[in-house]
Amino acid sequence: MSENLIAHLVPHQGCVITRRDGAIEIAGSAMNWVMSAAVAPLLCRAPFAFRVVGKTDSTNLRMHWHRGELIFNWECSVRELRVHDPATAEQHGLKDKGFLTPGDWHEIVWEIGLDRMRVIVDGEVRFDGKGDYSGIESAPSVGPCFGSTVSVREFTITPLDQAA
């Protein structure tokens, strides 16, 4: 198991991080602040797993890496998972794959391999796709959007076996 990085996350673009009960709350400094995020203080290259145990109070728990983004409880359609490809920024909408029960903790794992990525929520694969992620180096982040507050109790980065 990798180190829990919640104590080391850096606020970005209006992000306010509040420590509370063994977790952190992440909010934007303004009601509709777009892309506020708590950023890891390190650069990651594929293959790795970006794992968050988190919850949202309403909408928009977002995870980012390079040009990629995962959007759970999207404000336009809370049940649709939005996946933006880290290499191309191509957007995918997956019906009935994006809902997280507000107020409940969820384990989200974003596995980024050299040539594919998967999104796993509470043990269920919600996205599996191909791409070339071999040349990307970027810092992962997690945050809210459009007035939501996201809480995170675990934020880990784990190297993956390239054969996986």
Regions found by a protein language model. Give the residues of each.
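Secretory/extracellular carbohydrate-interaction modules
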Residues: 25-85
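Beta-strand-rich interaction surfaces with strong enrichment in secreted/lumenal proteins
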Residues: 35-42, 94-100, 142-143
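Short, solvent-exposed beta-strand-to-loop segments that form ligand-recognition rims
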Residues: 120-141
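Ligand-recognition surfaces built from glycine- and aromatic
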Residues: 134-164
